[in-house]
Amino acid sequence: MAAVPSTISWPQRLEQLLQGQDLSASEASSLMQAWLAEELSPVQTGAFLAGLRAKGMVADELAAMASVLRGACPLPCDRPNLAMVDTCGTGGDGADTFNISTAVAFTAAALGVNVAKHGNRSASGKVGSADVLEGLGLNLKAPLASVVEAISTTGVTFLFAPAWHPALVNLAPLRRSLGVRTVFNLLGPLVNPLQPQAQVLGVARADLLDPMAGALDQLGLDRAVVVHGAGGLDEASLAGANELRMVEAGKPIATRFVSPDDLGLAAAPLEALRGGDLADNQRILENVLKGEATPAQIDVVAFNTALVLWVAGVELDLKAAARRASDTLRDGLPWQKLQDLQRALSHGNGQ
């Protein structure tokens, strides 16, 4: 749809948003800047969040807002001159799986990919990546410079989102009080402070594939995969065909459907990927990284790791990539990567 004019007031913008009109990139940027500067009242902010959710986000809006948030998050030291990958999902699939993308991060790192994992605690009953990693001994309060430097020494790091985006802290109570998912759930995966050149991003709804892929393309990534998993997962699933958007710089975004058998993996129902409470998810993640998990747990991590190897340019044949990931998992090498990161972040707190 046509964007609303840029000279109108916030109430006029809201009115046209409620009529289904998209924001222009400049208006989306202005809205995010106003939120960060606390220029809008809580009522206005809640109305805009609800209006954007009801209308549905488009790539231009997501990319513009993400660019503002990226600019509001300066690094505490120089960015390492490394090609990096992030692996994450938007959440919201309600499937209560174990922490698949977290396992993928350490598996990919064990295969030589530099992984900058951006994550948070759970916003619902599901155990978030930060929750499970903290439970396994990772220091979430490590100095930010140490977090950045860790990727150079270990090949993997974990950026705990609240430590990097303090400007969003004031919005957190309002978002919680709304009780529904908002644009910020979509922006989280787009605002990794280290700005990786490649990314695997999972979405729980098929209608988010194109907006998120378009946003990643506009943000200038070299390669990315946006995946909507069979059964509604926000990562590749073993339950059937998974719908992908393949993003490559300078090329049209491509659609691909990939099933587990395409990668030489066995199909499995979603129940085989279930997690549980924090203790359950810690145990499953440790077992996966040590190569002691169930075949389905190993296979789903291998599937998603194959996508990481593709975006990183390490292995462009997904079947071969999945085989490499499976071998690495069975050797228990990803567990060593987690231990390496634990040691790198073990000292110090705060900035």
Swiss-Prot record:
Task: List the catalysed reactions.
Answer: N-(5-phospho-beta-D-ribosyl)anthranilate + diphosphate = 5-phospho-alpha-D-ribose 1-diphosphate + anthranilate
Free-text cofactor note: Binds 2 magnesium ions per monomer.
Residues reported in the UniProt entry to bind anthranilate 2: R175
Q: Where does Mg(2+) 2 bind?
A: D234, E235
* Membrane-spanning ranges: none
The record's comment on protein family reads: Belongs to the anthranilate phosphoribosyltransferase family.
What NCBIfam families does UniProt report for this protein, alphabetically? trpD
- Protein name in the entry: Anthranilate phosphoribosyltransferase
